[in-house]
Each structure stands twice: as structure tokens, then as C-alpha cells.
UniProtKB/Swiss-Prot annotation:
Binding site for GTP: 268-273, 383, 414, 507-510
One of the record's GO cellular component terms: cytosol
InterPro entries: PEP_carboxykin_GTP_CS, PEP_carboxykinase_C, PEP_carboxykinase_GTP, PEP_carboxykinase_GTP_C, PEP_carboxykinase_GTP_N, PEP_carboxykinase_N
List of residues binding substrate: 76, 216-218, 267, 381-383
Name by which UniProt lists this protein: Phosphoenolpyruvate carboxykinase [GTP]
Length: 599
């Protein structure tokens, strides 16, 4: 097997990099992945035999598997995620920076011999539609068959990508290891990892990623957050486009007119639910381009076009149910991998929120018999990895090489007070300030940070690959290019009343907010009123027919809380101070304008 890959790779730069890596990590075997279904099944079979994967009941979930990770490798690890640029200033105050030379030396030591006793897999992948001029090719070298199978679902992967790369194409070097070499005769564990030495490192000078010690999704599937956001955002800054942590949907009204919207929410704030929304209002349709990442570029006609670079969903399982997201359950019905969920006695999967009553006789995510009233059966960051084309509401343009034209950009977060249900920016600059000022209650997708309110500008705090002040400036620069820019909105489904209950019903009823946004992009002025914080819906402008929502509740959702907003402005201004003199003045001017108008 070791020599087979040589004849199939015509790219001399790729060949020499692979040889370098093999010499460094000393694998027992080398395998070039072709992305075929036969290869996927063989690797899944191999993982079943090793006790890594459990085949689910094929009558309930055809061709689906359950994987349990180590309890200390369950989420992205921001404290061990580094951006290596020439200077610390280029990475900015929100990123962990290390000197590239020092970090390379440290990683060289960690990777030395780290694949002993393991197979090295070469995984060619493409972020974006094959043969789109905007797509990026990466090669991930990994010692994890779980990563190989997940990359087959999450990216366009295999022989077709090598063919596309040819003998001289540009590619991103992505090196990953679980960091647990095996001595001769040593028995492997089900989920090898090395929590004491985790490193997820991005080198912007040569567009490469090195990840060590973790097998978890965001740390190990290097095409996702690493290439498609952290490296791509840096590239976009240089080339005049945006790589964003955004869902993209097509919304069609009862007259048959369709518009595309992009929306940025922090992890576990409902991106996947909105991306797969099933409207209750008659005649409306919502279709999904993607639920997590959007690459946005100016088109020849002056509009901004969005592409989803991914090929699958890596969705949060907790809370996903027939009520909250039936399309997600349909998407992961077959050909999917579930990680850290519970296993039922009949070979099905379960997680908190899937049904009102937990089934009897389950095995929890740690592999133990589960008893009600104890620890959760599924980990809070349990995931499903499912193919994009299994989504029942997939948009026909999902694979378009040019992308889809955006008419609205939406920012949202999990805020229990102050922030209204929906409002629209007064200008592009004001909209950029709205994105820069985003904050949200944190979730289980980030290790060790559950339940705190934190600033998360554009939902990109963990994913922006350069100085965020320069990133804000980059967003602002689109106003000076003569483009037909989308309108910008803010939404907040998570307002609570004095009893701690959510005021807005959410989920499929969020279509009512999308309807207001749709009508605003049509230029309907009568449905909005201008306030210091932006255009808010009039009470009659928001369609609440058939909702059990009192007038008082509606008014509180659409009110400008003067005191709360003064505190919000101060809070955003204080946060902006970490960027010092790099902070764009337009954002500070917008904050001052709001403050003055609130008086």
C-alpha cells in the first residue's frame, strides 16, 4: 500500500510534501483516499471491528453509525487554537498568536514519529463546488479513519479533487494527527487523542494548518473552520471577498418571487434550525444552501453572491426534534455519523430534546447504562454529520459555481433582554456596527465556557484569521465599491419575560420575521418606523395573525429599551477599545450617533 499513492499523484509539490510528512511522522502504512463508497464502507467496517463505531439499526437509520469520543475531546478548543502571522498585530487581540518559526519548531517535535503503528491517510478535498473558480483545494493528511469518513460527508473528497488539482494547482496543506503513536503490539483505544498537547495552528504565510492531539470535528476536519474560515478569511481580505460563519437560505413568497438571505449566528443559536425552516404560513417556502459557512463575493452585476463551500452538515443534535427541525431529522436519517449521542435498546439514537420522554434502557454517550435523573444521556455538543444532498429542503442552486445573489444579511444571537425581535440598519456602516457589536450567551460548542455572555463580532470571534479591526474595515470597504449591497438586519428569538419564559414562539414561526425582512428588501416603507437603533417593525407591519401573542408581548419585542441600549452602547464601546487605534472610526461614530439619539 505504501508505494501505491506515488503513481497516482502527478503534482510534484504535493508529492514532495507527502514524502516530508511521512519522514516526520513514521506511519506503518500510507493510503491515498479516492472518496469512493466502497472505501467509506471498508473504513466504517474497520472502525466497527476496532470498537470505534456502532452500526445503528438499518431499519431506523440505514447506513448510519454511532461514535463515542473520549470525554476530554468533545468540542473546539479555542485556548489551543493559534493564528501564526509574521507579527502579533496582524493576528490582533482576539486571536492566540505565536511566532511562526517558534511554533513550527514546537510542532515538529510533537509530530516526530506521532503516526507510528498507524495508517497515514491522504485526503484530497475541495471546499466549494468542483470546478468553481472560487473553490479551494486542500490535502489533509491524517491518522484518523473517523476523520476520513467525516471528510467524505463534509467535503467534495477523493480522486476527482486530485484530477482537478492537476500537476500544478494550488493546494492548502492540512496535517492532522490524534497524537497517540502505537508501540509494536500495543492495543489501540477506541478514541485516541492527546489532550495535554492539543494544538490547532494556522500559518497564514503558506496557507497551511497543523492540528495535533484532537479527533473532534472542528479541530480535526481541517476543511471546515480551519480552511473555509480562518485561512479563507485571510485570503478574502487580500482578494476582496468575505469568508463568513453564515447560513444561506432561499425564501420564496406566495407570489413565487425568491430572495436569498445570509445569516450569522454564534454556535447553537439556531443556524441549522433557520437554514432548514419549514414555514407554517401558507404559500411560503424556505430552501437551504448551507447552514454554517458562506463565501461572499461581488458579482459582475454588482450584487454580492454567496457560495456554501461545504458538502454536508455538522449539526448540533441536542434540541433537534420533529417540532424544532423535522428537516434535520430527515437529513440525518441515512448515511450519517452520530457522535456522542445516546444509543437506545433498539439501535436508534437519542439526545435531550429529541422526544419529551427518554426511552428506557439506553446507553449514554460515555458507553454506560443511563438512568433518568442523572447525567445527560447525550453530550451537550453531540453532533450529526450528514450529507448536504439529503436535506429535503435543499435549494436547487446549492451547487452553483457562481453562488446566489444576497438581498439581506442577518445577524443574531442569544439575548434574553434589550435586543428587539428584529430591526434593520439605517446604513451599511450602521449594519457593520451591528455585526461588530454582536454578543451572545455561550454554548457547549466551546469547551469550558457554557452560559456566559460574550462578545462575538459577526459570529466570527473564533474563526477570523487576522486582526478583527482590519476585518471590520474590510466589511466597511464594500460601501465604497459601487455595489448593490444587501440590507442588514438583526434578529433575536431569545427574549424572555419577567417569568423567564421565551416571549416569541420561534422555530417555524420565525418565518414571520423573514416575511418582514422580505418585504423590507422590496422597499416597503409603511411596515417600519425609524428609531435610534434602526428600523423596527410597526405593530401592524409584522404578521402575527394566528399567534397566541398579546399586544403587550409584541410591544416588548419591538420596543427600544432606552436604558438597556445606553448600557449596550457602552458595552460595545468598551469591547471596541481592545482594538485601540485600529478600530474603524465609522463604527465608533455609529455608537455615538445612537447614544445621542437615545437622549
Amino acid at each position: 500500500m505504501t508505494g501505491d499513492w506515488m503513481s497516482k499523484i502527478t503534482h510534484s509539490g504535493l508529492k514532495s510534501w507527502i514524502e516530508e510528512v511521512i519522514a516526520l511522522v513514521s506511519p506503518k502504512d500510507v493510503r491515498l483516499c479516492d472518496g469512493s463508497e466502497a472505501e467509506y464502507q471498508q473504513l466504517c467496517q474497520q472502525m466497527q471491528e476496532a470498537g470505534v463505531m456502532t452500526l445503528l439499526n438499518p431499519e431506523l437509520h440505514p447506513n448510519c453509525f454511532l461514535v463515542r469520543s473520549s470525554p476530554d475531546d468533545v468540542a473546539r478548543v479555542e485556548q489551543f487554537t493559534f493564528i501564526c502571522t509574521k507579527t502579533k498585530e496582524e493576528a490582533g487581540p482576539t486571536n492566540n498568536w505565536r511566532d511562526p518559526q517558534e511554533m513550527r519548531a514546537e510542532l515538529h517535535e510533537l509530530f516526530q514519529g506521532c503516526m507510528q503503528g498507524r495508517t497515514l491517510y491522504i485526503v484530497p478535498f475541495c471546499m466549494g463546488p468542483l470546478h468553481s473558480p472560487f473553490s479551494l483545494v486542500g490535502i489533509e493528511i491524517t491518522d484518523s479513519p473517523y476523520v476520513v469518513c467525516s471528510m467524505k460527508i463534509m467535503t467534495r473528497m477523493g480522486a476527482s479533487v486530485l484530477e482537478m488539482l492537476g500537476s500544478s494547482g494550488t493546494f492548502y496543506k492540512c496535517l492532522h494527527s490524534v497524537g497517540k503513536p502505537l508501540a509494536p503490539g500495543e492495543k489501540d483505544v477506541a478514541w485516541p487523542c492527546n489532550p495535554g498537547h492539543m494544538r490547532i495552528v494556522h500559518f497564514q504565510d503558506d496557507s497551511s494548518v497543523m492540528s495535533f492531539g484532537s479527533g473532534y470535528g472542528g479541530n480535526a476536519l481541517l476543511g471546515k473552520k480551519c480552511v473555509a474560515l480562518r485561512l479563507a478569511s485571510y485570503l478574502g481580505h487580500k482578494q476582496g471577498w468575505l469568508a463568513e460563519h453564515m447560513l444561506v437560505i432561499g425564501v420564496t413568497n406566495p407570489e413565487g418571487r425568491k430572495k436569498y438571505f445570509a445569516a450569522a449566528f454564534p454556535s447553537a443559536c439556531g443556524k441549522t434550525n433557520l437554514a432548514m425552516l419549514m414555514p407554517k404560513l401558507p404559500g411560503w417556502k424556505v430552501e437551504c444552501i448551507g447552514d454554517d459557512i458562506a463565501w461572499i463575493r461581488p458579482g459582475d452585476d454588482g450584487r454580492l453572491y454567496a457560495v456554501n463551500p461545504e458538502f454536508g452538515f455538522f449539526g448540533v443534535a441536542i434540541g433537534t426534534s420533529e417540532k424544532t427541525n423535522p428537516n434535520a431529522l430527515a437529513t440525518c436519517h441515512s448515511d450519517s455519523i452520530f457522535t456522542n449521542v445516546a444509543l437506545t435498546s433498539d439501535g436508534d439514537v437519542w439526545w435531550e430534546g429529541k422526544t419529551a420522554t427518554p426511552p428506557q434502557g439506553m446507553i449514554d454517550w460515555k458507553g454506560r447504562n443511563w438512568t433518568p435523573g442523572g447525567e445527560p444521556a447525550a453530550h451537550p455538543n453531540a453532533r450529526f454529520t450528514a450529507p448536504l444532498d439529503h436535506c429535503p429542503s435543499l435549494d436547487p442552486q446549492w451547487d452553483s459555481p457562481q453562488g446566489v445573489p444576497l438581498e439581506a444579511i442577518i445577524f443574531g444571537g442569544r439575548r434574553t433582554e434589550t435586543i428587539p425581535l428584529v430591526y434593520e440598519s439605517l446604513s451599511w456602516e450602521h449594519g457593520v456596527m451591528m455585526g461588530a457589536g454582536m454578543s451572545s450567551t455561550t454554548t457547549a460548542a466551546i469547551a469550558g465556557e457554557l452560559g456566559k455572555l460574550r462578545h462575538d463580532p459577526f459570529a466570527m470571534l473564533p474563526f477570523c484569521g487576522y486582526n478583527m479591526a482590519a476585518y471590520f474595515e474590510h466589511w466597511l470597504s464594500f460601501a465604497g465599491k459601487g455595489l448593490q449591497l444587501p440590507r442588514i438586519f438583526s434578529v433575536n428569538w431569545f427574549r424572555k419575560d419577567e417569568n423567564g419564559q421565551f416571549i416569541w414562539p420561534g422555530f417555524s414561526e420565525n418565518l414571520r420575521v423573514l416575511e418582514w425582512i422580505f418585504r423590507r428588501t422590496d422597499g416597503e416603507d409603511s411596515i417600519a418606523r425609524r428609531t435610534p437603533i434602526g428600523y423596527l417593525p410597526t405593530e401592524e407591519g409584522l404578521n402575527t395573525t394566528g399567534l397566541n401573542l398579546s399586544r403587550d408581548a409584541l410591544q416588548s419585542l419591538l420596543a427600544v429599551d432606552t436604558q438597556g441600549w445606553r448600557a449596550e452602547v457602552n458595552n460595545i464601546r468598551e469591547y471596541c477599545s481592545i482594538f485601540g487605534s485600529d478600530m474603524p472610526r465609522q463604527i465608533l461614530e455609529e455608537l455615538s450617533r445612537i447614544e445621542n439619539e437615545l437622549k
